Design a protein with these regions (language model features):
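Generic recognition of flexible, low-complexity loop/linker segments
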Residues: 27-28, 66-67, 175-177
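A metal-dependent hydrolase metal-coordination microenvironment
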Residues: 1-57, 64, 73, 79-94, ...
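Short, exposed beta-strand/loop patches in secreted or surface proteins that constitute
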Residues: 20, 70, 165-169
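Solvent-exposed residues in well-ordered beta-strands and their adjoining turns
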Residues: 58-60, 181
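Anion (oxyanion) recognition and catalysis
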Residues: 33, 98-99, 103
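Residues that flank catalytic or metal-binding motifs in active/ligand-binding sites
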Residues: 6-9, 35, 74, 105, ...
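C-terminal functional module detector
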Residues: 101-108, 113-205
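Alpha-helix termination/capping residues and helix-transition junctions
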Residues: 69-72, 103
């Protein structure tokens, strides 16, 4: 769908589509859903402005995206880092979408190079937590959100991102536990009424 001279678009997976164009994004979502594929929305913050007020059904607003995620199970996530970190809007929009879909419908974040030349390589990537390197395991990881995204500003291709092997969410204790190798730097608020934050550094083995 063309918006302001660019295509408001998504990536398709497991469908064999050859770049067909549709009159609306919903038509494209429905087509991929019928084929049993999956989709990730590309840099949606480009088409949304935090300075504008959107109705819950207005195109490109958080309510509109949230409704699409609830309607089409084929939509598994959206880019929150794109071509480095071009648009912080992507993450703000992601948060507003999650406020409308959680806890019944999760929406997973992804990081994409959006590579148009060699200089744009190696900054954005995702680790998929898979038992085996198979298509079925990749599909399963995408459906369940068993992955984490990374952004390396310099794009050296040698960034030392933590290697996380497992993530466990405990709904009762409201905790997230991970198994990983590497250094993790946590930043968290000290209390709900204060804007002050503390940081803790721990080595995870």
């Amino acid at each position: 769908e063309r918006t302001g001279g660019e295509f408001n678009h998504h990536n398709d997976f497991f469908t064999g589509r050859q770049g067909q164009e549709f009159a609306s994004l919903q038509e494209s979502y429905a087509y991929t859903y019928a084929l049993g594929g999956m989709q990730i929305i590309n840099h949606p913050g480009q088409y949304w402005s935090i300075d504008n007020t959107y109705s819950e059904t207005q195109k490109d607003g958080p309510g509109w995206h949230a409704n699409n995620f609830k309607t089409f199970p084929s939509l598994v996530g959206l880019e929150v880092y794109n071509q480095g970190d071009r648009r912080a809007n992507d993450r703000i929009l992601w948060d507003q979408i999650l406020q409308r879909t959680m806890p019944t419908r999760n929406v997973f974040g992804y990081s994409g190079d959006d590579t148009h030349n060699n200089e744009q390589l190696f900054r954005n990537y995702n680790y998929m937590l898979m038992e085996d390197l198979t298509t079925e395991d990749l599909k399963d990881a995408m459906r369940k959100g068993e992955s984490y995204f990374c952004y390396e500003p310099k794009g050296s291709g040698e960034g030392k991102a933590p290697r996380i092997s497992a993530i466990e969410v405990d709904e009762n204790s409201k905790t997230i536990s991970i198994e990983a190798n590497g250094l993790v730097h946590w930043i968290y608020a000290t209390d709900k009424t204060s804007s002050a934050a503390s940081s803790a550094r721990s080595t995870i083995v």
